[in-house]
Amino acid sequence: MLLISNVSVVVLTKNNQNTIEKTLNSLLDFEDVVVYDNGSTDETMNIVKKFPNVNLVQGEFKGFGWTKNKAASYSKNGWIMIIDSDEVVNRDLLEYLKNKNLKDDTVYRLNSNGYYKDIQVRYSGWTLTVKRLYNKKVTSFNNNDKVHEHVLSEGLKEEVLEGSINHYSYHSISEFIIKADRYSTLFATNNVGKKSSSPTKAFFNGMYSFFRTYILKQGFRDGYVGLIIAFSHAVTNFYKYIKLYELNKELKK
């Protein structure tokens, strides 16, 4: 088997015992995989240690941007591909990478297919391209991005690679609730004192998020799953701005 030796994969983990093995099995074609764990208390690290091509690092979490840059610093290669701990790299992308001539002035996007349980979500904004492959000697993530982090690509070219990854981001409705609380808190703490908010703004942001996901992005075509996603987006955005409102009030005291 021809291994991919010029690209290092970086994966962040914390209590991902249900998904990490499937993720790492899809990365066996890479010689260098860095798993950066932030305090797992389940079987995640024991599972990770079974893979000979993985360098397991334990460290702190300071927001997604900073943490991904920190994890990338442990890689053997300049080229970094970011994969989430609930994603699977498909064979077509692996084979394409083995023959791809990567260019330093380009940030590469991956086609991402979203799944709820084992149901592919074809609408609702879940089929997209994401900036995941870059040369760390040229660019990086913004260290200040606590959530919704992205690779800085100003002044660089962007190219979508052939092939895809599957993103198994949610396996139950409870996970939507947990992530809504986590991401809304990260947003609020990252923007306290920087952005204004109000109960009215929180309400209308939530309502518009539902409309955008369910109608504009045709979430209704995903059946009941589309309804779950649309409501989750509404709740997340409502809590983002209502939490920010409360934190701003505390700041003024």
Describe the predicted segments one by one.
Residues 4, 29-30, 75-78, 102-103:
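Active-site acidic short loop of glycosyltransferases
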Residues 6-8:
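Cell-envelope/extracellular polymer assembly enzymes that use nucleotide-activated donors
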Residues 10-29:
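Short, well-formed alpha-helical segments that are part of the catalytic scaffolds
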Residues 26, 37-46, 84:
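A conserved acidic beta->alpha catalytic loop
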Residues 18-21, 42-50, 92-93:
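Acidic helix N-cap motif at the loop->helix transition within catalytic regions
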Residues 66-72, 79, 83, 90-251:
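Catalytic-site signature of metal-activated, phosphate-bearing donor transferases
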Residues 45-74:
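Conserved donor nucleotide-binding strand/loop of the catalytic core
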